[in-house]
Amino acid sequence: MPHSQCKNNHEKLSSEISIWAAGRIVIMADYDEYCWIGENGEGTELDLEFPDWPEIRELHYAFLTWLCKMTSRRPGDDGRIHDFDWVAFHKEGIFLCKRLKSVLKESVDVCYMKPFEDPQSDGAGLIRID
């Protein structure tokens, strides 16, 4: 195996271990990120964590399209977005999470969380995706 390929495999494995060690991926729309990992919830993007996975790259772009539906809206003075179809937004977000879980299988927990901008999100916890 050429050194460069060996190095790429090592980098891929290191990347995967970093997110697996975190044990959980939380998908939550925010203005800068959609994916949060680790105990401290550091923001990241799936294609950065899994650069050599075509299925993840496809999901990354699907999550960005989903995220833009919310971030293109202007929040009110209270920081919430009131004129928005949150039911459809969450349905799509959970659907994408299920696709992500089907790719990652049992390697990590995938969870969904409603963003602060949803007026109905008060006290809403994590939804674990099975």
Spans of features found by a protein language model:
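Intrinsic low-complexity, intrinsically disordered or marginally ordered coil/linker segments
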Residues: M1-D130
